[in-house]
Amino acid sequence: METRQINVVGKMVEIAEGATFADVAKHFSGTVNGPIMLARQKNKLRELHQKIRTCDDVTFYGIENDEAMRVYRRGVLILMTKAVYELWGSESLVVVEHSLQKNLYCEIRKPEMEMTEEVLAKIEGKMREYVAADLPICKRTMRKEDAREIARRQGMPDKDELFRYRRASNVNLYELDGFYDYFYGYMPASTGDLKVFSLMAYENGFLIRFPDQKNPEVLREFSNPKKISSVFLEQMHWCQLMGVKNVAELNHTLTQGKFGDLIRINEALHEKKIAEIADMIHQRLDKVRVVLIAGPSSSGKTSFANRLCIQLQVLGIQPHKISLDDYFVERDKTPVDENGKRNYEHIQALDLPLLNDDLKKMIAGELVDLPTYNFVTGKREYNGNRIQAKKGEILVLEGIHGLNDMLTSEIPAEQKFKIFISAMTQLNVDDHNRISTSDSRLIRRIVRDYQFRGRDAAETIRTWNDVTDGEAENIFPYQENADAIFNSATIYELSVLKQYAEPQLFAIGEDQPEYITAKRLIKFLGYFLAAPGTEIPNNSLIKEFVGGSCFKV
């Protein structure tokens, strides 16, 4: 038998001709954290079932890697969808609704089925049988027509419709012991390593809980974010009422000439929600003096703040917008991270004593000189920007630390109204493939950065992990402290953003480190029909990203 040598994780290894990545991975299980889920050669990811065809260096990824963790999740999903199909047949529609603290909330659409512990035990028991059997998960390439027939036979009309809009003539399905499913993204080679998971009854369905990426032998902690969950469930119900629950149904609105109506209904819903939040503030006007708005990157915070101020004025409340950016400490006092890099997202990067002192004076009705931060010199300046807030007027602050009480520690709790904003999309690719809220925000940011900040997509992707790490530390731990939550996602936006994002993503070469993410996003956007944004109103949050906003954003 012919053999050859390749460099695997820094070690020269002799492999047999025709060996797969899985064959080699068995000998390197101790080199990563948790089970190996994925391989990499040069700048391309490889599924473990694939044969090693080149002599390029090989790197293996365990679930501490985000791409490998996605593979693990999809592997557990096919265990679950097969189990439900085997237990109750094609009339039991399984829907993966959304992510909740990196767990997946799912429902089984079978009217007479109650999600009891007994039902969940049956599903999980089947799943663990498949794991114990170490069954292969096989990629099957077939004609689109054959894939649609399998989808219909297995009671998956969503996939049948999704494939209808697919441009390619072939489709890759994954087979697990005679059961077929479709997943957008890489899959495990077999079921044997998918040992750590659990099903937990939740709301009207159940959560699939996954391992902690840093400690893959145990489940990730779950703190039950009830406020965030209620927003997702409300959006899910609204999508069902609209008849646009997945990409195929969104594409259908385009082909039927109803896309403009969808835009107008989405925007009306946003306006209604913003008005409701303004009403909540108005009801507490005897105490509330400061409104704090916080949310992750590309949530549309600036446009939301402007629209909220308009709704407050409708109620006779005069708002005063204050930028937290103007309260940065001078550059030489900015905290640094472990690499010696200035960390502008650390709460101590803000002059908290000055901010609290100014807020107390404004609440007391004093005339206050507001600082302006000069980003060129890194110094604070005073340029005659003054505010004197009268009784009944509101101070509006927008920034990433708005929900953290440390920011406004000297302001009494009853004087503060906290708002969390994020793009929590409820639209799915199909019933088993959710759309990542993080990916949706990344696409927004790619479009905005290129349009208005002179950054190409590679630079945006390069810094995205730092952005999301900062959000995990500074924003998400405090989201349940919010008095109100605004979901800035729109059902229609990815059809519009597609035409702006795709050229930037295609510009990223295969030799660039950002290519892996770009390739994934290109494939994702390929599910959508492109739509013009001509009917989007100029006060829409989406205009903050594509241009044409009536606000200074």
Which role fits each region the language model picked out?
Residues 50-69, 83, 92-101, 105-272, ...:
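Auxiliary tRNA-acceptor-end handling modules of aminoacyl-tRNA synthetases
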Residues 291-293:
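Hydrophobic anchor at the beta1->P-loop junction of P-loop NTPases
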Residues 314-332:
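Short beta-strand-centered segment that lines the nucleotide-binding/catalytic pocket of NTP-utilizing
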Residues 329, 333-376:
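Conserved nucleotide-sensing/catalytic segment adjacent to the nucleotide-binding pocket
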Residues 301:
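Conserved lysine of the Walker
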Residues 356-414, 464-478:
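Glycine-rich phosphate-binding loop used to anchor ATP phosphates in small-molecule kinases
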Residues 304, 308:
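Hydrophobic positions on the alpha1 helix immediately C-terminal to the Walker A/P-loop
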Residues 408-553:
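Conserved NTP phosphate-binding and transfer environment spanning the P-loop NTPase/kinase superfamily
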